């Protein structure tokens, strides 16, 4: 199931990139999403910047049909591989993620680019729940949970961009 989101910031692409690759920002985002525990790493790999976030979450608001797959908690692991900036400062990232020990995966791209006087951060994900018969029924719940987390992260990004 496809998930597309974007947020606009009163900042340059370089400033938005600095925010999304800041360990403290990612840790605050984990706290905003009520992670029970988390691990954030930001590292360089050649000209790429790799952001890996692993967060343990309570499995609340999970449909009964999914509860047997996740238990009381779930661990969400997301990796963004941000590529070198283009001449205009824009950047793209490959995004991959999973809910550990479940048949849930996500894959897609993210982009930071100038749009007039603002900068837009956009994400385009394909979320899959690989469970015969019920996977397609579970995907909307997973997408809604991811959308909620991304919205909290975008809201926090606005706070950071305003500093």
Annotated model-derived regions:
Residues 63-66, 134-136:
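Short, charged, solvent-exposed linker or helix-capping segments at domain edges/interfaces
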Residues 1-59, 64-65:
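Hydrophobic ligand-binding cavity/cleft-lining segments
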Residues 69, 87-88:
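Low-complexity, acidic/polar, glycine-enriched regions of mature
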Residues 65-73:
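Extended Gly/Ser/Thr-rich low-complexity repeat segments
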Residues 49-52, 76, 81, 89-143:
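Beta-strand/loop substructures that line and gate deep hydrophobic ligand-binding cavities in soluble
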Residues 16-20, 123, 157:
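Hydrophobic pocket/interface hotspot
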Residues 71, 77-79, 83-84, 135-163:
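A conserved amphipathic terminal alpha-helix motif
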